Amino acid sequence: MNLLVINPGSTSTKIAVYENDVPRLVRNIRHTVDELSSFSHIIDQFEFRKNLVLKELEANNIPFEFDDIVGRGGLLKPIPGGVYEVNDAMLDDILHAMRTHACNLGCLIASELAALLPGCRAFIADPGVVDELDEIARITGSPLMPRITIWHALNQRAIARRYAAEHDTRYEELDLIVCHLGGGISVGVHHHGKAVDVNNALDGEGPFSPERAGTLPAGQLIDLCCSGRYTKDELKKRISGRAGLTAHLGTTDVPAIVRRIEEGDKHAESVLDAMIYQIAKSIGAASVVLYGRIDAILLTGGMAHSDYIISRLKERISFLAPVHVYPGEDEMEALALNALGALRGELPVQEYK
């Protein structure tokens, strides 16, 4: 079976071609600021990115012959985890999405390209809006603001399944805490195959991260909103985009920050240690959801490469459960394996409604 995987990100479009579970081509098509600045809205980049995918396949002599095309899922309405076939309802919701992100282009490009091939199907898998929260986890102190989830569902679930396979068991039989350490940070409580509690890692909950603010003091945030000093869009960027490490230290580059610390930068040390402290505190809070009965804590994402971060996290959390580290992320493989499982009948294909 031949699969095409498409993963649009903020500044790049990653593609991969798989023959069954073997990658035959993996490419990261980078987009310059000048290229993207010519588009008023992210959704307007659709044709541009689609054509780049086709050109990359042609440049590498890859025949345009696929059994399915799987795209990164976008910011749809909340849905359970799993594999979904792209349909008209999904496309309509993406075209009118309340939140914008390059990931919204994944299902659009997959659907458009699949339509060119007889019998080819278009899928998404485990988008960031996967919502399997226990009802008790949704309730906040204000009925106006129930909790929502936007998190690294694809990578968290892939790492959880990988851990299960390594330990000769099933994801659906485990109680895990999975922490994705990237530009955003999500801490998920996985109970028997479902993420029953997880923070909104995009715009306003959990630990602060390289570019996101995490949970903020509500009263001060209201005062700032009403101060007249910032527009709505400016404030949103101060919550997600120009927040966290980059707001404090002017960079999201953790290795560079660690070098500053080694050179005696006490402010950099205080800020990075504060982020680690907040991550550990969130993991500790997550342990309560499972009554302390945790099979393992899994740390993944780009920052899991940092010995500085991982060593200090382990000091604070290793008393809770065994800690396993899976640096980086492989969303391309996760998407491919989900699509392959759907084609083989090993995973159910769900209908988006």
Language model: regions and residue ranges:
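Glycine-rich phosphate-binding loops at beta-strand->alpha-helix junctions
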Residues: I294-L313
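Glycine-rich phosphate-binding loop plus the immediately following alpha-helix
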Residues: L105-E112, I139-D175, G183-G184, H192, ...
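Adenine-nucleotide phosphate-binding core of ATP-dependent small-molecule kinases
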Residues: K237-Y291
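Conserved phosphate-binding/catalytic loops in two-lobed NTP-binding clefts
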Residues: D307, S311-L337
